[in-house]
């Protein structure tokens, strides 16, 4: 087998780039596939029929202000106001039902009697917030007692103005093959989805985009004062078979309702309130909603008092005519003790501040309970993620029952607004015919051919195709209680059985116990210093034993130093149990990082891949990793992997860059160096040069792009921004022509599920669907390449945005299916193609480099250190 070491290293001639001048339109479907065995399936799409296709939605803008002109924020009060408006002024609105988005837009079926309205809406039943706590500008006990017996109505001004007309029939062309995906169609779908959200809001649900959650939605405790709850995602979708309603089970995280003190104890894993870190508590509690136990009223927390409850003073006031007159200073503790005669155990702890920045309003902790259905958006710990995944799994039949029950319970088509459109929704799932593609043949060592069964294989009694000897290596242990010598012996023994020649490690380095409590960066620096004292020469490879699985803070600094400064490949492990299977999986990763090949596709080994074998073809996987929710100071990390050693499609190199937080389009594919005509620091320059270097001095004439992480609204940006950058980078290398492109978006974050119509198991590996539930005109299909053993399988949704190469549907689907079998660190078909998976791994690993960094004070995104030349060309991310 020819490898990169035998290929010429001729330089690429570099010239200024030519203007790209390419405008691409999203391609339409070219037909459907035919290969594979047919299989009967059902899916969580429910057919929608419309008896009144000529209905027109009328859109109106809504402005809500207080009587003195202040804008009203918050969907809760806004929805309450609009409900009251409809009850009060229904006749003025001609009795028309309103679909309100909770913000600034409402819709009706047909027009309202006039284009503009000004309403005065009075909402009763609200207590005055400032009368239920104690405020620095606050009220006395006398005023508070009077407020117990009185409701305070408030008046609001609501203005409604005509904005636009949206014909419903723009989304109904799907049934006649005449669907046009323009803005009107998207607007009509949005109206229908708003109706679903409004229906859920009326039932008191928590709304998260197009999903809604009940307080009794199968709570799942995951620790830390957080619980997961199960709800439903629902959205209308245009499909090849007509309009459909897509319903799926969804899960979100909420705060566990109850006493605030109990939440803080659980969140910080402490036994008593005295152990609570109040600085952390203040950050955690900010913006949470609580209900006062001494008053039936909710508040939003803005912070904690600066002093304990028994020391925090406020001015007690009484009303003297129209004026409030201070009578004396009193502590919050004394006020509540005198007024409510209840013992207060939180006297030495801070109070909750539920007022405003210029007017604090204090409540003792034990008088406050967290209200239900408050979404928790902070990152989960590794343990919490595991518990959530385990608790939220549903087998196919269980999920089918949940969805069917929901359709019968919620009666979507009985909604007055939808009924006014003549919309009816079938109660049974859509039936669809799929195909099961034949798994590709794999090539192992000793010229062994093997065909996987249901997306799985193993290396029992098999040799790696191209093993890399491990000659100079060491083991370092960051205080994990294990026998490092035993691990090395077992690894050597396992390597022999797989064809890997492994020498004994020349050093076993244990962490100095005095640094065990130090910070992660310091621990890594001390370990590196110890290694350099013990090692005569840098090792080729290091096996690193971490103290925790998946959540170790040492991982990022360790990888950063080894890959960027030392140029040493490393494999991190946390061996809870040593077994042959565990060590085999570790060796698959090590061999890939060192430049070996574990297995190849049979058609790849024999140079027989359609449309790729004869024309130099570069395959790219692209992804962007963002920081955790709520961290706007953490830069995003863009990663692109490119194939090498053409015509192979199993070997890749990664290039990684940071970019502005939450920016989804990759902006570093082409980065010309200022004041030069030849320099390019962009991602694609690295990958083009690597392809040329390892592919017998050939430049790619075809480029296949697999893009992950973009939504349908960003498809055109991929073509106009990212493909354009790739063309410019290519032309910078001295080429006047432009390669042919095939651009495919790979999505996993969607809500379509496939089920066997005649069996309880998940759909078999290789299942593909390209009819009925796909887009009416665009080129897309669903593929479940992997075999789901736990829960319900989620297929990948592939959108073909551009196909200049000209794949037939069968050739493209089989190529994508085959690319799910080339992940060198896996012995199962992956749920998404390997290039996308590799890009995700590279972005996630390098994101750990910046874990302890943020945006600088001048707003600049920190640049990543470049990988050391010893490791940059290999698959360090495996």
Curated annotation (Swiss-Prot):
SMART domains listed in its UniProt record: DUF1785, Piwi
Biased composition (Low complexity): 1-17
Keyword entries, A-Z: Nucleus, Plant defense, Repressor, Ribonucleoprotein, RNA-binding, RNA-mediated gene silencing, Transcription, Transcription regulation, Translation regulation
PROSITE patterns per the UniProt record, alphabetical: PAZ, PIWI
Tissue: Expressed in roots, cotyledons and shoot meristematic region.
UniProt entry tagged with the keyword Repressor: yes
Major localisation: nucleus
Stretches assigned to the PAZ domain: 259-372
GO cellular component, one term: ribonucleoprotein complex
Top-rank taxon, per record: Eukaryota
SS bond list: none
GO biological process, one term: defense response to virus
Record family assignment: Belongs to the argonaute family. Ago subfamily.
Listed name of the protein: Protein argonaute 6
Organism: Arabidopsis thaliana
Gene name, Swiss-Prot/TrEMBL: AGO6
